[in-house]
Structure formats: C-alpha cells, structure tokens
C-alpha cells in the first residue's frame, strides 16, 4: 500500500499578493484546492475526512521582524511573512485543511535563512520529516511557492530522506518564469517526479 501525503509550501499572503508576490500564485492555490478535491473523491470520502485518508502538511515561513534575510538587515529580500502578520498567514481558502499538528514553521531563527520546510517544526517541536515517518509516508506530493527556492529545497530534502517526491507543476508559483523552468528541469534530473 502506498501511503501518500501532500506538502503545501508557503501558500502565504506575502507570496500571493504581498511584499514578495510570485507569478501564478492565485492559480497555484486554486489548482491545489482542485487536487485536494480530486484526492477526496479518489479516496471515496467526504471533505472533512480527507486529513485522515491523505494527510496535508503545511510549511510556513515564520520570520521575526528583524530576520537577517530582510533588506533592512542587509539581506536580499523585502520583509515578508513576519510572524503574527497577515502576510504570514496561510491563504484563507486552504484553512479548512490546516491543523496545528501538521503545520511546520521555518525561518524562525533571525540569523538563519531556511528555504527547505523539511526541518520546519510543528507546535510540538517535531520536524516535518519525523512526522512524515510517523505517518508511514512513502510518497510525498508537493505544491506551493516558490519553485526556485522553498519548493525546490523542500523537494530535494524529501528526496534525500528517501521519500518518493511528486511535484505538482500546476500547483506551484514562482519568482521568475525562466528560473522556474530551469528548476523543474534540474529537479526532474535529480529524480523528482514532475506531474
């Protein structure tokens, strides 16, 4: 039996329509909801049962206001996804699928840039990788924002940890179209399934 899970990377307002808005972000959210709906139907369940049949894990950039990656601190990015702000919130259409235990924060240490959600931790302090193992996950489907950074790093870390990684190409947003295409090509060469 294949044990599947979905990892939703950084579908947060600052990456959708805020300080670091990415290309294709609204479409990525819409397509992610369609994918979740298709999994609900495939499993023969109701919407409220999807989390039991097909766990959905959320990765959340969760920065302190003085994070070292921000331009104001000498970094390369505008301030974004600051903990406790609207920009750091998960898109409202995805909230019915969010649970505290399956939400993992990254970028919390102001001195460390953290693109991958693999080491992000939940409210109990458990890293995402550990939780996926506890769920007996073999196949991880990934969607989110942005292809060239957090999505790619998360996919690569999942692959290194031994999971079969399926990147949902219609459910991702990106900073730059050419960079997005290059990242997809390189991830496919690494063994990540682009679907």
Show the residue positions of the predicted features:
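Short, electropositive alpha-helical surface patch
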Residues: 68-81, 111-127, 159
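Short, contiguous clusters of charged residues that form electrostatic/catalytic patches at enzyme active sites
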Residues: 30, 34, 123-126, 130, ...
């Amino acid at each position: 039996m294949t044990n599947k899970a979905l990892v939703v990377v950084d579908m947060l307002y600052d990456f959708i329509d805020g300080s670091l808005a990415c290309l294709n972000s609204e479409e990525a959210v819409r397509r992610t909801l369609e994918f979740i709906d298709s999994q609900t139907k495939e499993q023969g369940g109701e919407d409220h049962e999807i989390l039991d049949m097909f766990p959905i894990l959320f990765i959340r950039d969760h920065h302190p206001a003085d994070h070292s990656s921000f331009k104001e601190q000498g970094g390369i990015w505008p301030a974004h996804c600051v903990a406790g702000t609207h920009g750091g919130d998960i898109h409202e259409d995805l909230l019915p699928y969010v649970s505290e235990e399956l939400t993992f924060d990254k970028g919390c240490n102001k001195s460390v840039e953290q693109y991958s959600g693999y080491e992000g931790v939940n409210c109990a302090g458990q890293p995402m990788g550990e939780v996926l193992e506890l769920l007996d996950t073999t196949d991880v489907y990934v969607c989110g924002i942005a292809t060239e950074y957090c999505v790619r790093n998360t996919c690569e870390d999942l692959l290194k940890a031994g999971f079969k990684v399926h990147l949902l190409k219609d459910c991702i947003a990106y900073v730059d179209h050419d960079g997005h295409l290059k990242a997809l090509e390189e991830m496919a060469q690494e063994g990540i399934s682009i679907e």
